[in-house]
Amino acid sequence: MNFILASSSERRKELLKRIVENFEVIPSDYDEKEVAFNGNCSEYVMELSKGKALNVASKLKRDSGIIIASDTIVYFNGEVLGKPSSKEHAYEMLKSLSGEVHEVYSGIVIYDLSSKKIKADYSCSKVKFSNLDDKMIREYIKTGEPMDKAGSYGIQGYGGIFVEKIHGCYYNIVGLPINKLYFLLKEMGVNL
């Protein structure tokens, strides 16, 4: 079976290797602004993931293979926290998350190029941050790590020191809930 990861994320590549030995990487250039947030996080991340999968499918000149696409958001106080637009924006996000609980949603879409069948699911995890002081936040931002991550932190990196506890799937917070992915692939009849 030919697998295609519709992402350039190093984190997703590392996680996918845990369940799929060989795969091709074809990043999506889907414009996420095409999907308006309607207040439902699970629908939103699945719709974004579907857009990425179909975007990659439209670039391919083949009729077999499985496309795997995912999108992750942080949700806090009624707002979606995406990737920060600047260091100051990252600071504001991290300061707002300090001492609070937020939710991390990841959508997963599996698209079979031969049958045109789509399966979608999502995962939600809750994350509690410790109280962060300004120095901690500024030092973290200097590492550059928060600049390409939803919510301005990476639990698998230096940002993990901010996390007091989680409820749910750790891999979801990293960016690819491999348990959900494994069972979605099984539902599609893919043997791993």
Swiss-Prot record:
It is found in: Cytoplasm. It comes from the Bacteria. Its cofactor is a divalent metal cation. Keywords: Cytoplasm, Hydrolase, Nucleotide metabolism. The record marks 11, 72, 156 as: Important for substrate specificity. Its EC number is 3.6.1.9. GO terms for molecular function: dTTP diphosphatase activity; UTP diphosphatase activity. Belongs to the Maf family. YhdE subfamily. This is dTTP/UTP pyrophosphatase. It comes from Clostridium tetani (strain Massachusetts / E88). The lineage of its organism: Bacteria, Bacillati, Bacillota, Clostridia, Eubacteriales.
